[in-house]
Amino acid sequence: MTRELLARAPLENVSLPEIASRSDVARSTVYTIFGSREGLMVALAEDLLERGGFARIGQALRGPDVVRAFEISMDVAMELYSQEEPVSQALLSLAAVDRDASSAAARLNFGRAQGMRRLAERMHEQGVLRDDVTVEEAADILWVITSFETYAQLRRGRNLTPTQVGERLLGMTRRTLYRETGDGRRETGSGK
């Protein structure tokens, strides 16, 4: 019920009494389960991550060829972002004006910065990064490229399909981060 309320009107104050009423349970039941409105919002974020299968992104990133692993992870991310777009967008919009929702939004991004740092280090170790790009710069660029907010801007602002968004983001990554191969092309992963 919380997902539906939030997606329907993201900037409305989604209250525990309304959620309890629409779920046909007592308000005290919601408090017993979640502890607070913030707890409910964080549980919603956890559900979004689990239901969306976001663990698949991490699995993809562990592939031996870092470029190919990143490409696969981006394909997975675009699929998941599109599946969970209404609730993710609503939660992130509400987070700008609601402290309880901001905790939930932070949960959605938990670990992504560190993960992108590790990815940038692997790119450096495998000789993928351009010489003029530091690991720290690469991590920052990857952090922006992999965010839901970046996906949403291209999806809605440029009216692109999820596949097109992924292609644009991978193109940006190649041109910004990857060194040229001996034949003047950019790294593209062993599978391409």
What are these regions (language model features)?
Residues 5-39, 43:
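Helix-turn-helix
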Residues 124-172, 180-187, 192:
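Hydrophobic/aromatic-rich alpha-helical bundle segments in the mid-to-C-terminal region
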Residues 1-3, 19, 29, 44-48, ...:
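Generic hydrophobic, amphipathic alpha-helix propensity
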Residues 8, 12, 44-67, 128:
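Short, flexible, glycine-rich and Lys/Arg-enriched loop motifs at helix boundaries
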Residues 34, 93-98:
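Short helix-capping/turn signature of helix-turn-helix
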Residues 37, 43, 56-83, 109, ...:
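Hydrophobic alpha-helical connector segments
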Residues 75, 79-92, 100-126, 136-140, ...:
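Amphipathic alpha-helical packing segments from all-alpha helical-bundle domains
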Residues 1-6, 77:
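Short hydrophobic clusters on alpha-helical segments that form packing/core surfaces
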